[in-house]
């Protein structure tokens, strides 16, 4: 029946992962302290994205951009994404997890405890999981400490783990 289908769908991990966490105030944000905020969609890291990042950052190391040499000489038998490309995708992946409303603005504050676990091989798909590790009210400014993990599809070890810090200026 349609009700059973809806019930099963709404309980599935895939459906839950597609739902954004919506936050409208500091108090709502604080209510997630220590709790998971969600999981982004999978995102493919292809050679075009890697080449564009290499051009933007002037980092054209062969392990990232020389497909033929990587096939012949790299232990991965493929090019790999720049570690900082994986990090640079964090804002996009974060936006897929959380929607923060009633803002004047949001500012990236910093990163802590960042570790690259393993390289992202070209053509791999990544996604991010996040939870609120800490939160502070700094005279009306919300400082959120987000514990994140960027995982690689089919791999046990993550590509990147760390703590992102954002300042949210609520209206």
Give, region by region, the residue ranges found by the protein language model.
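HotDog/MaoC-like acyl-thioester-processing domains
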Residues: 18-32, 120-171
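Generic alpha-helix initiation/capping and coil-helix boundary signal
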Residues: 1-2, 47, 157
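Alpha-helix capping at helix-to-loop junctions
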Residues: 95-99, 119, 135
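N-terminal amphipathic/basic-hydrophobic helices that include classical n-h-c signal peptides
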Residues: 1-18
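Short alpha-helix capping/helix-loop boundary micro-motifs
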Residues: 111-116
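Hot-dog-fold acyl-thioester-processing enzymes
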Residues: 19-108
């Amino acid at each position: 029946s349609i009700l059973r289908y809806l019930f099963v769908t709404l309980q599935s991990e895939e459906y839950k992962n597609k739902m954004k966490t919506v936050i409208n105030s500091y108090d709502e944000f604080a209510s997630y302290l220590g709790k998971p905020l969600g999981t982004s969609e999978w995102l493919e890291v292809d050679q075009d994205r890697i080449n564009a990042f290499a051009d933007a950052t002037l980092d054209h190391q062969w392990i990232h951009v020389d497909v033929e040499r990587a096939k012949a000489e790299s232990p991965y038998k493929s090019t790999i994404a720049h570690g900082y490309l994986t990090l640079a995708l964090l804002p996009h992946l974060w936006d897929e997890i959380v929607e923060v409303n009633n803002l004047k603005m949001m500012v990236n504050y910093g990163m802590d405890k960042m570790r690259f676990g393993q390289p992202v091989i070209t053509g791999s798909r990544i996604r991010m999981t996040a939870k609120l590790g800490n939160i502070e009210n700094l005279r009306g400014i919300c400082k959120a400490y987000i514990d994140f993990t960027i995982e690689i599809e089919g791999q046990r070890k993550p590509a990147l783990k760390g703590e992102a810090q954002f300042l949210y200026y609520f209206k």
